[in-house]
Amino acid sequence: MKPLSIAILLGVCSLGAGVGGFSAGCQSEAAPEQTPRSEPRSGADQPAKAAGEVVASDVVIDVAMGRALPPYSFSAEDNALLDEVQHGCFNFFWYAGDPKTGMAPDRASEPRVSSIAGVGFQLSAFPVAVERGWVTRAEAEARTLLILKTLAGNSENRKGGLFYHFLDGATGGQPSKAYEHVVSTIDSALFFCGAITASSYFGGEVARIADGLVADADWSFFVSKGDSYQPYERNFVTLGWKPTSLVAPTGSGKLLPYVWVDAGDEHRLVTFLAVAAPTASHAVDPSMYYRLRRGLGENVPGEPMVWFPWSGALFVQLFAHCWLDYAHLGPDNPAAFEVAQRARVNWWENARRTTQMHRDKAIKNPAGKPTLGEHAWGLSASDIEGGYGVPGVFPRPLVMKGSRPEWDYPVTNTDKIVDNYGDGTIAPYAAGSAIMFEPAAAIAAMRHYRGLKKADGDALLWSDPKMISMGWGKTQIGAGRPGFGFADAYREAEKGGTGLWVAPDYVAIDQGPLILAIENARTGLITKLFHQHPVVKAGVKRLKLGPK
């Protein structure tokens, strides 16, 4: 899960009339070299009023004829920039980890705490590093094996085959210090995506261990059932499981009272893997994927998009695209599974429209935040000064004629769904990862971030990956130059020069999507590896998605 813990659930999940008052809807041919437009298309600052009325089953969200799909061609200058950015991300995963396990930390400042999601991104980053020549295949394979053996060999790090959100980076077991102690379905899903990618790339013993872990995942154990959940919340994958006591982390406990019920990226990724499970008794019915609610909204007239009101952060459109090649799967078909009142959606196009909305609203910048602009956009979850923030923006909601409240779309007071610009902090990974959808705008944003300077002329956000001189596990965070590329987030000063802030830390689940999204935009390597795997092929077939 993108927020650091379930405690930040309010920023990402549905808050309807569910259990305990919470009903969780929780929880990559325009040439890239072209300069992106400088004026936003029409759109709303705050979607307080409905944009119009539609019958959901009549809506098809698909790619316009002639629009370029990834992978793209980039200029030599752009490729040089992308090499640098990816190399910096890889340095985090290679150098910041614990030498005993190989596992990258959740954040560089806490080397003993790893997130299983971060490890999933880490495993997927290693094939990129081999193909780019930063490490040898043998080195990457050995590190991958070390990580997988560590995780497979510790029986206290998982329940029902899914992993605890946070683990001890030195042992792969229960951490003495963690932000939460829960078995997390989304963080496990992100790990399994990395394991599947590694299995396809390395084969051999890596595949044997990785495939075994994937097969052990019993998604059916985590499905919401019974009176503990509202009727419209039942038979979805829950966010996870919490033990009764940490003394017995695999003993008794209970499912969390939150479910993946909306069609954000995290919801779909969890449910896809649950459908694709290679062990028949562990799998869920494919119709669950199509029952995920698809609330509709609009930023540009005539271009509907699926959205949900619990988070307008850009990351909710990014994660699944790091592995699933939605661009070439075409619009899905809920009606084929007898699920009514659902739009047919090409999820790549849906993410592109959402990306466009984020940039449009940053250019208009009605909140007057000094950081936001033509080349600084993509409000998303990240560190902020004094904590962690999940800002975001929303389309105008469309009235879904004939649809059932709560069952087909989340119920909320649309007058209170307003764009949340937070304190104006921007995380470079957000616009950078959107290179999968809007390559020209993403390149321009990364070049902007790369060129920002301090008053003394030194780089504001950039730490050159070529300058890395530390040993494995010595991150030199205090020195401020660890060689990990972009800082996690920043906020520019207000007029008068006060308020400048740059995040001092580096976060695995921000570095991860950036390196993978760029690679998919350049070569499609990660989506190709993912779709080569038998488990993924089975999931695509079961869901009757288009050919890869």
Task: Give the ranges of each region predicted by the language model.
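Bacterial N-terminal signal peptides
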Residues: 7-24
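Positively charged n-region of N-terminal signal peptides that target proteins for export
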Residues: 1-5
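Ser/Thr-rich, Pro/Gly/Ala-heavy low-complexity intrinsically disordered linkers and tails
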Residues: 23-58
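Ser/Thr/Asn(+Pro)-rich, low-complexity disordered segments
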Residues: 52-548
